[in-house]
Amino acid sequence: HAHGDHVGNAVELAIRDDATIITGSELAGYLQSKGAKTIPTGIGGSKDLEYIKVKFTQAIHSSSINDNGTIIYGGLATGILITAEGKTIFHAGDTGLFSDMKLIGEFNKIDISILPIGDNFTMGIDDSIIAAKWLGAKQNVPMHYNTFPIVKQDPNEWLDKLNKAGMNGLIMNYGDEIEV
């Protein structure tokens, strides 16, 4: 979605690496106006790329860009299902808990779900546990916490609650890798 902590230097990286950014249509248009190659999408839309398939889902969150003091609407925030080699990862994006996560879990065999736990701007620990239950992933990974004081959370508390609810979780640090 179109917040600075997500857009970051995506345009510069895309230009440098001759990469294409796939994102919601409003944000795609903005990034394209800055020189990036994009593939615009929408919620519910999927795209088969060379090695992967992506499908965008709803996320409940704001989405705007501050472009030199002007606030620009960035389209709807999204989550994304990424499928490659028969494995599916669900990145929930910045979101609150919403009941259609049940449908995402019902219609997709999710190997790994990546869920926010930071609270304040996204769901917190307890709602993330509910989301994990609804999604039914084999493995869950927390995200969007401890980047700013306002989203300080204890990921071990999340992991304990997740395990007590009978689900698997993994706390990852920068540079960690996981086998899907």
Residue ranges of each PLM-predicted region?
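Hydrophobic packing residues within well-ordered alpha-helices of enzyme cores
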Residues: 10-13, 31, 101-104, 158
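Short active-site oxyanion
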Residues: 15-20, 87-89
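Divalent metal-coordination and catalytic microenvironments
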Residues: 1, 9, 21, 54, ...
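Binuclear metal-ion centers of metallo-dependent hydrolases, dominated by the metallo-beta-lactamase
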Residues: 20, 32-46, 129, 133-180
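Histidine-centered active-site/metal-ligand motif
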Residues: 1-6, 61, 91, 144
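Metallo-beta-lactamase
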Residues: 78-135, 143, 147-149
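Di-metal (Zn2+ and/or Mg2+/Mn2+) metal-binding site signature of metallo-dependent hydrolases
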Residues: 1-17, 24-26, 30
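Core dinuclear metal-dependent hydrolase active-site scaffold
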Residues: 41-105, 173-180
